[in-house]
Amino acid sequence: MQLSATSGRTSFRVSQDLRTGPANFLSGLRDDDSLLRQVFFSILRHHHPNLAAKVDVIYALSQAWCTSQSDNDFELMVKYVSDLKPEERILVASSFSHMLNLHNLTEEVNSSQIGRAVRLGEMDSPTRDTNHSLLKLTTTNGFTPQQVYDTLCSQTVELVLTAHPTQALRASLLKKYAIVRRELDTLHSKRMSEYEKIETLEAIRAAVQAAWRTDEIRRSKPTPQDEMRSGLSYFSTVIFDVVPVFHRRVDTALEKLGLPRLPLDRALFKFGSWMGGDRDGNPNVTAETTRDVVVLARLEAVNVYFRQVEGLMFDLSIWRCSPEMKELAERLAAAESRDAARVAEERKRRNYVDFWAPIPPTEPFRVVLAHMRDRLYNTRQVLHQCLIHTHMSVRGALEEAGAYVDIEDMARPLKLMYDSLMSTGDESVANARLLDLLRQIRTFGLCMMGLDVRQESTRHTEVMDAVTTYLGLGSYASWDEPKRLAFLLGELQGKRPLMPPGMDMSPEVKEVVRTLRILSELPGDSLGAYIISMAKTASDVLAVVLLQRETGVRPALRVVPLFETLDDLHNAPGTMTTLLGNDWYRGHINGVQECMIGYSDSGKDAGRLAAAWALYETQEKLVEVAAGCGVRLVLFHGRGGTVGRGGGPTHMAIRSQPSGTINGHLRVTVQGEIIEQQFGEKEVCFRTLDLYTSAVLEAALDPPPAPAQEWRDLMSLLATESCDMYRSVVYRTPEFYDYFMQSTAASELGRLNIGSRPSSRKSGGIETLRAIPWIFAWTQQRLHLPVWLGIGEALEAAIDKGYGPVLQDMYANWPFFTSTLDLVEMVLAKADSRLSAFYERTLVDSSLAPLGQRLRELLAKTQQNILIVVRKSVLLEGNTPSQMSTPNLDEKIRLRSPYVAPLNVLQALSLQGLRKFRDGGDTEYNPSDPEIIDLLSRDPHKKGEGAQHPFVSAMDDCLMITIKGIAAGMQNTG
């Protein structure tokens, strides 16, 4: 049977077998890809019939080349694309970008279908989940159910959302694509009438058409407040609702083992944020910015709790209750009855859904909930005032108004209601929406996500130097480490104030101090950790402890050193030995120390393999140092989304950590496009929570065995060899920087407006470039150099020395090594030497061509040696543990490739055109068609006096669209 949905001049069909069972998910993926491409082409033909024909030809040419890999087929595609007019290039780029994003939706739906089939028992799970972990630990590993229960109840995963500029898609498009994803999933998962199917297809068409008519390019840079609002949208639409659903699933799994539910006061997850708190290298994050985002997050929390409480007022109409509940309700009702008319009028003015009049004590739950609703409303009003009047102390204003400041003020009456319902035998009512709200309160608090503050270590040194210089004590910046430590510890153990009022300050020093003073005026639960980036010494930590005391930050934020470069990672154990060896400091931290390890800068500094091994060894040594000092260490993993910045499948990434470094508590960043990939939809969010929970549980009870000494020794040799090779190319090859800047879009990425932070810390070479644009640029150019450079030579050297069998044994039996090579293999499968060579041919000075040829030879060598170690004939052959989290990965990459290749060609041509024009080249391009002029005039910042030449506008837009499209094709940016 086939169904036809017709709109305007076109029609498209969907085969019934798209919605059959899970017998062939790969076939379903191809069918979904074909369906959405068909829908898109029907829209394109409706609006641009001539252009649609050209897009169709380019897609066919790209498919032919991706299949044959022949130079002739490639040149045919290049020739056809090169002949496009500038305005056609924009629309063709946009077409392929949209088709890639639509294809990605089919992959997400495919994953959801597989997950659903697993839960129905129709197929084995390709990844671990909490239910499987509970069964495995109790049946296979020999742990008692009580041991597993106690471990689960004590573990916490904290996911810290960051605003790193790696989400290339606009929120406007994400919302439309979410509709397509939902409706496509509906086609698969529901029994539908013929009319319902047609209507669902029309809904898909409407969303795709709206997306096509939406400008893909973000025309102005987002502010940190914009980034926070974007992050909060995931909570209000997805995460807040999924958390209690996931806890219910865990409760059910526990009950199947004869265990009780999770305790009411336990939260398996906490959420944090860097949005508006990360000021490292971002001048747009000011003290006022930090204040704003805290207020915005609290407003979001109050709004969602308000809706939940109002819903409970309809649910809990019950009259029977415990004596304690009755006493509270009568007391609140009596207070209201003294001014009943005013209460009713005020509630009516507030436009509540219902329950305006004072509620009688015979409905005790509603009495208490009405009081909570009033207080939430008041809290919201105060927070609105704080946004308007920026001079107000947020904490002071909330306390003065009697608004909610402490989450326990909300939790206590709700817990009383729960206990009351349980005592009267109304367990089912207690364990419905009320239990969900209790779980949400324990997870999100009143802050939704606690804000970390991050600042670079030298900024604190500047403040301390200003203080000591003003006091006539000398220059703190020139002191050696022992003198700094002696001074800081002396001040911390004394009681005198250090910073005199009216002290002269530079603007930079003033901003650091102003930030700390703002923190002192914010509710303590809204703040998380104070992260010190580029931390190198114990004094870096103590300086922040002292500055918090001097500025009145109470309670003080825990101070977390971030070790990022290879040298800093190697020196971290010594730094922490000095710090934790101090009696005063150990007492100050109450026996718990958090350290952050950075995956991004270490990889950029030393290469992927050397960084991975340094991170592994550093974690082991930090745990050992902390244990020796009687301190519990919490490791905060600063992972990025890409493999080059520590990204990878969640479960395998956690299970490959050194034994004893997780211990039931994981704190990890969720960056950029990964937020959408992990929390963009409820089914996906549920799976994300499931993976983290099961992985941390298994890491605590069933950690991987320690690697054999022979493996460690060989790994150290590999790390040294790969680091030397990586640095010799990146930092010691004089022409490398020029090749990088010419062959990639690195210098143009800053105009993409995907984040508030600049792409470089300061002007200079590779050293000053941030890790994100460094990875982003090579990803776009398809060489993916930061991920693999140095690894092929290191493996080859080891194989030549006879270590091939040892490497194969390491790969088969050591999760860390398995995960590392599998992720590199996955990236190698996305690399494309032919396209990279086209960038070089089009953009790079011929004198640099030998370097490009050498890099491509190194890529081929890496692919060859990886295949030897993993015992495969082609990349991604079979299902390895790391790749099992993405079933059919090789086929998915093949399906994406014909969409990506034209975008790479268009990007190289756009860069060529822009650079020639800016170097003084001339063009006769001067369109007169009003529709084309309108297309080239979408940027409001480039009109009037700021108007660009139409050719530059066309190439600029084409470039920006290709950057976004290729990011979608690679499924990551930086």
From Swiss-Prot:
The keyword Magnesium applies. Keywords: Allosteric enzyme, Carbon dioxide fixation, Cytoplasm, Lyase, Magnesium, Pyruvate. GO terms for biological process: carbon fixation; tricarboxylic acid cycle. GO terms for molecular function: phosphoenolpyruvate carboxylase activity. The active site is at 164, 604. It is found in: Cytoplasm. It catalyses: oxaloacetate + phosphate = phosphoenolpyruvate + hydrogencarbonate. Optimum pH is 8.1. It comes from the Eukaryota. InterPro entries: PEP_COase (IPR021135), PEP_COase_bac/pln-type (IPR022805), PEP_COase_Lys_AS (IPR018129), PEPCASE_His_AS (IPR033129), Pyrv/PenolPyrv_kinase-like_dom (IPR015813). GO terms for cellular component: cytoplasm. Pfam families: PEPcase (PF00311). Activated by glutamine and dihydroxyacetone phosphate. Inhibited by glutamate, aspartate, 2-oxoglutarate and malate. Its EC number is 4.1.1.31. Through the carboxylation of phosphoenolpyruvate (PEP) it forms oxaloacetate, a four-carbon dicarboxylic acid source for the tricarboxylic acid cycle. Exists as a homotetramer or heterooligomer. Belongs to the PEPCase type 1 family. This is Phosphoenolpyruvate carboxylase 1. The lineage of its organism: Eukaryota, Viridiplantae, Chlorophyta, core chlorophytes, Chlorophyceae. The gene is Ppc1.
